Amino acid sequence: MDINEIVQYLPHRYPFLLVDRVLELEENKRILALKNVTMNEPFFPGHFPHHPVMPGVLIVEAMAQAAAVLSFKSMGVKPDQNSVVYFAGIDAVRFKRPVVPGDQLLMEVEITQSKRNIYKYKGVARVNGEIATEAELMCALKTLS
């Protein structure tokens, strides 16, 4: 899935769109998504000027965005002005390796539980096969009206 299709499933846009490509997607199971981390990211000038590191919260957000794509695709719907997937919870977060400019962040997110419009996931973000971040995520699909 390229960026043109991804933006059909995510409301995020620059500078907060953190999924560049979906490599694999098994509906109701898992997604494998990619974020190319470049020196042009808007957060690097401040985090940190002489040693740029991608903020851990944005790595977790990138996994949550991948989870949202998986959820919408699995439900067979696209977000619109009346629906949104909210990041509802996070547990067991571990940051194991810094993510720096030039890295390709490979995010694998699997659905571990779903009930009505609430989904739980296990996410692992890797760089060159090495775990950078792992977390348990929870998202909720909400209808806005």
From Swiss-Prot:
Protein name: 3-hydroxyacyl-[acyl-carrier-protein] dehydratase FabZ
MF GO annotations: (3R)-hydroxyacyl-[acyl-carrier-protein] dehydratase activity
Family according to the record: Belongs to the thioester dehydratase family. FabZ subfamily.
Species this chain originates from: Azoarcus sp. (strain BH72)
CDD domains: FabZ
Cellular component GO terms, alphabetical: cytoplasm; membrane
Pfam families for the chain: FabA
InterPro entries (alphabetical): FabA_FabZ, FabZ, HotDog_dom_sf
Keywords of this entry: Cytoplasm, Lipid A biosynthesis, Lipid biosynthesis, Lipid metabolism, Lyase
Lineage: Bacteria, Pseudomonadati, Pseudomonadota, Betaproteobacteria, Rhodocyclales
Function according to Swiss-Prot or TrEMBL: Involved in unsaturated fatty acids biosynthesis. Catalyzes the dehydration of short chain beta-hydroxyacyl-ACPs and long chain saturated and unsaturated beta-hydroxyacyl-ACPs.
SUPFAM superfamilies assigned to the protein according to its UniProt record, in alphabetical order: Thioesterase/thiol ester dehydrase-isomerase
Location(s) in or outside the cell: Cytoplasm
